[in-house]
Amino acid sequence: MTVQQLSTTVIIIGAGPAGAGTSFFLTKYGIPHIVIEKETFPRDKVCGDACSGKTALVINRANPEWLAEILGDAQSFLPSWGITFVAPDGKSLDIPFTLARTQETPAPGFTVPRMVLDDFLFNKMPSPYCTIFQNATVSEIARVGDSVKVTMTHERAIYEVTASLIIGADGDKSMVRKQFSGLDTTPKTYAVGLRAYYEGVTGLSKDNFIELHFLPEMLPGYLWIFPLPNGMANVGVGILSEVVRKKKINLREQMLHAIKTNPQIAPRFANAKLNGKIQGWGLPLAMERQNLSGDNFILTGDAACLIDPFSGEGIGNALYSGMLAAMAIQHAVEQNDFSGAFLKSAYDDVVYKRLGDELRISAALQKLCKYQWLFNFVVKKARKSASLRNTISAMFSNIDLRDQLRRPSFYLKILFNR
């Protein structure tokens, strides 16, 4: 069989949010690239389906018309105005994402099935600068001199694609990471999650608040209930792999047990129906700084282990890291420098400058979650104090305020009502 030769500036492995985010901005910068995707869109992706304000920010920067399209499609995208924390003792706390809500203000976040979101993003990628191969199987990734070469099979044809740079946007089982980085996850930096779609869950917020239930048996993980369009809800659990292994937890049994027996949750599922199967996936958490690039390669999204350790949200950071990768690539192309040293400065350092504080705080909060008494204490105090609720709300947009959660002085102030 004849091997077809292709060359480009950048190869992107994976067409999910991280790959799409990279592609959008490479197109903006006029940089040719080839996207290689193993599946065919639309395709499902197991996920919590919640999108933070970071998702909206990147999409808006890519093209404001795309965000307007999302905000105007209530059948596919459900605006979310806040979050409900349920403490281990069952007490709940509603926290809006913003205190400055008006009729003209778009919701800071939204929920959407990943099949819908990823297909939306995928269909925005085609451009004169972007060539896409779907249903393509990569058999080899190698560095050849100052370039990278990817060998793939597509529609019974074999291709060798050569480029100056390769982007690993291929998820937590990334081939690019495995080949070039040596970056790997451990049970302490990896979580496992289950996702189920239910129809007919009652008691959902009229403002579509997402819910995090910190059940004692799941700490430092939680059970979530996220409202979706058309009366659906994404219901799931996420727990550190280390905890699952040590306690020999059966996630599926634990989730279903909570749905059937928990006094706050069970009545809401009395007439709910499971739609499809309960499915699992892995979450590589950003618990510590890692090397995100090297000679001729950059890792983005889950391949770069950039999932928020506290919230478990990865879509926003996937898109955001893709945008930052494209910015770094623009500089690399201008300087004709694709070395690890240059990319570390142009990409790694920028990622951690933009996201580092947020991720460090989230990692600390994730560790604090195992203290039931502390969680119960903060929720109890916040239920009685409007000013404390407002402070917690402001933490969603103010990283310095959020940092207070790591400090003992914050809890002393709550204790003495200061």
Residue ranges and their predicted role:
Residues 330-418:
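C-terminal helical "tail/cap" subdomain of flavin- and related membrane-associated enzymes
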Residues 27-47:
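Glycine-rich FAD pyrophosphate-binding loop
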Residues 45-89:
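N-terminal FAD cofactor-binding segment of flavoenzymes
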Residues 243-328, 333-337:
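FAD/FMN-dependent oxidoreductases across multiple families
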Residues 124-266:
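Predominantly flavin-linked oxidoreductase catalytic cores and closely associated redox partners
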Residues 10-12, 33, 297:
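Conserved hydrophobic helix-helix packing surfaces used for dimerization/oligomerization
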Residues 3-18:
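Beta1/beta-strand and adjacent pyrophosphate-binding region of the FAD-binding site
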Residues 100-123, 245-250:
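Short beta-strand to alpha-helix junction loop
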